[in-house]
């Protein structure tokens, strides 16, 4: 929603919007740090949940601050003052950077907690449940935004926009913070202080950050999967910062209508996650499911262009459901592979590395999505916006093809052999010390 508001209502350059939003993902290296910290240091006998709570408090607070910063940046752009523009653009980028740190603090320990509490057989279904709930949240959020912004149709007064959006964001932050707290209290087994401290001390001695990094570099399969995750996520989200603007400029959709694109995408994703988690992935395997999901995503991107040629909102909504279905199948299998390509002793660190790949690609997607749209407008030199948006979708389809090529080179058995051998060497070296 915010990207649509900034690009279409406040007339921000698309590259500026994509660049500012990308700062959230540019803080992705913090994921590795928070993963390592949660592996080694407990708070009150708990390894994961305290970091989840701290991160949630941070990103909820920053979300409420985003609205005044966005509108202050808009005022600065309108004023034409170089000093004012520079200051507020830096403030906007800094806010999203801090938001990224808070998200890293909450999300990496959370996924590590999933690994702590499940085994390899349980994880595909657990991943399916997690992403189903995430998708339900996207659907509910899209509907709530659509209802809350219904009064903003044809509104051009920034003061009215800001007031409505601020009230909505305050309520969202309160609800999200409460849900996270209620969902995580008591889920992690608490250890006695002596046991926790003793175990923490052993962890610190067993595997340091330097040794963890050496282990991560020990298998070529880790690099292959890292690059696959980067391309898969980029291929899935490159259109994300421009999709609502696509609905606005090509299909003439109002704000409340374009926000519903996420709801239709979410419904498809929910169906895809359920199909993949309960039937497709267990039956055909994770690699085959991931490959199928990638091909379906590629087809969906081409259908987005076809929908633009028809100019039919109904066709666009059908394509969004198909796109979501493709994303659900691909995401379930990719995340199941991600959790398999992790060793229990360093769950937080490995999840941090995989999260780094995803976050880097989300950052690239936000910058490239806006930048490619601006480039497409320049190259097309036309008043027809479809050509510029189609340029982005074609590039995105090419990225998905690269992800498929990388997936064909992935070997999970080789990963286990490489990392288990390296882990044994590290532990034996520490015992000798």
List where the protein language model places each region.
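C-terminal ends and interior cores of transmembrane alpha-helices
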Residues: 53-85, 295-311
């Amino acid at each position: 929603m915010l990207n649509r508001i900034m690009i279409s209502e406040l007339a921000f350059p698309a590259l500026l919007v994509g660049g500012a939003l990308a700062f959230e993902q540019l803080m992705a290296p913090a994921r590795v740090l928070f993963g390592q910290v949660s592996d080694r240091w407990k708070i009150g006998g708990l390894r994961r949940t305290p970091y989840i709570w701290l991160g949630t408090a941070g990103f909820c607070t920053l979300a409420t601050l985003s609205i005044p910063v966005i509108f202050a940046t808009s005022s600065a752009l309108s004023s034409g003052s170089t000093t004012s523009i520079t200051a507020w653009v830096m403030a906007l980028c800094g806010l999203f950077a801090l938001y990224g740190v808070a998200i890293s603090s909450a999300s990496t320990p959370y996924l590590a907690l999933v690994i702590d509490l499940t085994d390899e057989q349980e994880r595909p279904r657990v991943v399916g449940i997690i992403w189903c709930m995430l998708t339900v949240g996207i659907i509910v959020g899209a509907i709530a935004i659509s209802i809350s912004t219904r009064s903003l149709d044809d509104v051009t007064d920034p003061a009215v926009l800001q007031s409505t959006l601020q009230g909505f964001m305050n309520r969202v932050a309160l609800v999200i913070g409460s849900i996270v707290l209620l969902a995580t209290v008591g889920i992690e087994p608490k250890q006695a202080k002596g046991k926790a401290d003793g175990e923490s001390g052993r962890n610190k001695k067993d595997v340091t950050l330097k040794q963890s990094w050496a282990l991560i570099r020990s298998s070529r399969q880790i690099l292959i999967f890292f690059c696959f995750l980067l391309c898969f996520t980029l291929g899935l989200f490159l259109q994300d910062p421009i999709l609502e603007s696509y609905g606005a400029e090509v299909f003439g959709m109002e704000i409340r209508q374009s926000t519903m694109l996420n709801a239709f995408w979410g419904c498809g994703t929910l169906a895809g996650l359920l199909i993949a988690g309960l039937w497709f992935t267990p039956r055909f395997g994770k690699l085959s499911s991931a490959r199928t999901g990638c091909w379906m995503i590629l087809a969906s991107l081409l259908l987005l262009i076809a929908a633009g040629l028809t100019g039919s909102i109904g066709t666009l909504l059908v394509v969004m459901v198909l796109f979501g279905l493709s994303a659900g199948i691909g995401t379930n299998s990719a995340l199941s592979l991600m959790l398999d390509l992790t060793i229990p002793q360093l769950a937080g660190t490995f999840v941090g590395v995989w999260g780094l790949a995803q976050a880097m690609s989300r950052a690239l997607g936000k910058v490239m999505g806006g930048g490619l749209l601006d480039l497409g407008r320049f190259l097309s030199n036309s008043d027809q916006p479809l050509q510029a948006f189609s340029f982005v979708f074609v590039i995105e389809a090419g990225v998905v093809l690269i992800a498929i090529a990388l997936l064909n080179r992935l070997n999970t058995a080789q990963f286990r052999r490489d990392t288990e051998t390296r882990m044994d060497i590290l532990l034996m070296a520490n015992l000798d010390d």
